[in-house]
Amino acid sequence: MKPFINAALAALVLAAAPAFAEVVVIVNPANGDAVSKDQIANVYLGKSTAFTPIDQSDGSAIRGEFYKKVADKDASQAKALWSKLVFTGKATPPKEVGSSADVKKAIAANPKAIGYIEKSAVDATVKVVLTP
């Protein structure tokens, strides 16, 4: 009976673990700039205007994974920071879109845009600059 209980517990733990897709940071292929993780974090935390940031929808798993891996923050911490910046008039928050396909469209339309998508969604319309 004990091996069955152990197996059941192991299955529950594995099933409860979040399954995140691998996130990549992308830019327009015409953009030849090399970009570091710190530079990307600064753009997404309102400390730099080097790029126009595109955010995935609030509450999405990929958004949480991106902020954790690139900015070392929860998505909720980043949202709170942006609320403060907007309230004080110091910055405009990233444009929010609903999916990786929408991020790719926004990147294709703006050579200064930067965004993040699942690695599996990468195609020739975008250039990967970071795999955190």
Q: Which residues does each PLM region occupy?
A:
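Flexible loop/hinge segments at secondary-structure junctions
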Residues: 22-132
